[in-house]
UniProtKB/Swiss-Prot annotation:
Organismal lineage: Bacteria, Pseudomonadati, Pseudomonadota, Gammaproteobacteria, Enterobacterales
Gene: mdh
Membrane-traversing stretches: none
Protein name (record): Malate dehydrogenase
Gene3D superfamilies tied to this protein: Lactate dehydrogenase/glycoside hydrolase, family 4, C-terminal (3.90.110.10), NAD(P)-binding Rossmann-like Domain (3.40.50.720)
Record: residues binding substrate: R81, R87, N119, R153
Reactions mediated catalytically: (S)-malate + NAD(+) = oxaloacetate + NADH + H(+)
SUPFAM superfamilies per the UniProt record, alphabetical: LDH C-terminal domain-like, NAD(P)-binding Rossmann-fold domains
Similarity-based family: Belongs to the LDH/MDH superfamily. MDH type 1 family.
InterPro entries documented for this protein: L-lactate/malate_DH, Lactate/malate_DH_C, Lactate/malate_DH_N, Lactate_DH/Glyco_Ohase_4_C, Malate_DH_AS, Malate_DH_type1, Malate_DH_type1_bac, NAD(P)-bd_dom_sf
GO CC annotations, alphabetized: cytoplasm
EC numbers on record: 1.1.1.37
Keyword line: NAD, Oxidoreductase, Tricarboxylic acid cycle
Highest taxon listed in the record's lineage: Bacteria
Length: 312
């Protein structure tokens, strides 16, 4: 199994590469690419870690050598959020970066599963889909927006509030990956109950957690380490499913049946060819139903922005 990380010299990319080097199954290959000249050195640095994962780094304009034979491509390239910016302020720079990289994926490893980490995910996934469609290689079961950070944050915050072990809590998060489009389904968390106030406060904290990190880093970056962990969890789940492990479920932002929006984050059963089954979002509480209806306009606008960027 070969995994390529594009944007591997950045804060998320380096954290992700470290976790993959230590956790990918023995015999895997890890390929690191970034425009930054330091990238081959990041690979050399990681190559000294004693795990049976081969690693190689590539830099420059052309990602082709890094992508050859890749089964999974994780894209974290782009600029990070600064205080006062929201994820959509990143659009102008990151849209072009994602478009360019996905064009290279379409050419070099069109059958790979692609995980988009670069924000704004609501929009960059739509860009990736349109680029792949134009190239005639789009498979909606193989393109994912990585929203796992919303899930791990939800698990952490719920566990803290309720005095549970974080590993015991799994919160499904649906919708999108910014602001009001992030909807944790707290009513579906097993063995835990919340007051209405707790639900309102937790939902808001989960939606604004990225901003919490941006402000705490005081202009020195955004959530890179927790995002690296989240992306590694998703990437490793995908690898396990591609290798035939049964019953691997993760939430991610994918093209579904369009019931709510063209792209929507929901629980997915992963399998040998990417998404095996888009699982139902289940029964929502009145609060969740209301939040779902209230976010769809924002989500649809985010998606349209990405579609127009490619097709203008």
């Amino acid at each position: 199994m070969k995994v390529a990380v594009l944007g591997a010299a950045g804060g998320i990319g380096q954290a992700l590469a470290l976790l993959l080097k230590t956790q990918l199954p023995s015999g895997s290959e890890l390929s690191l690419y970034d425009i930054a000249p330091v990238t081959p050195g990041v690979a050399v640095d990681l190559s000294h870690i004693p795990t049976a994962v081969k690693i190689k780094g590539f830099s420059g304009e052309d990602a082709t050598p890094a992508l050859e034979g890749a089964d999974v491509v994780l894209i974290s390239a782009g600029v990070a959020r600064k205080p006062g910016m929201d994820r959509s302020d990143l659009f102008n720079v990151n849209a072009g970066i994602v478009k360019n990289l996905v064009q290279q994926v379409a050419k070099t490893c069109p059958k790979a599963c692609i995980g988009i980490i670069t924000n704004p995910v609501n929009t960059t996934v739509a860009i990736a889909a349109e680029v792949l469609k134009k190239a005639g290689v789009y498979d909606k079961n193989k393109l994912f927006g990585v929203t796992t950070l919303d899930i791990i944050r939800s698990n952490t915050f719920v566990a803290e509030l309720k005095g549970k072990q974080p590993g015991e809590v799994e919160v499904p998060v649906i919708g999108g990956h910014s602001g009001v489009t992030i909807l944790p389904l707290l009513s579906q968390v097993l063995g835990v109950s919340f007051t209405e106030q707790e639900v309102a406060d937790l939902t808001k904290r989960i939606q604004n957690a990225g901003t919490e990190v941006v402000e705490a880093k005081a202009g020195g970056g955004s959530a890179t380490l927790s995002m690296g962990q989240a992306a590694a969890r998703f990437g490793l789940s995908l690898v396990r499913a591609l290798q035939g492990e049964q019953g691997v479920v993760e939430c991610a932002y994918v093209e579904g049946d369009g019931q709510y929006a063209r792209f929507f984050s929901q629980p997915l059963l992963l399998g040998k060819s990417g998404v095996e089954e888009r699982k139902s979002i289940g029964t929502l509480s009145a609060f969740e139903q209301n939040a779902l209806e209230g976010m769809l306009d924002t989500l649809k606008k985010d998606i349209a922005l990405g579609e127009e960027f490619v097709n203008k």
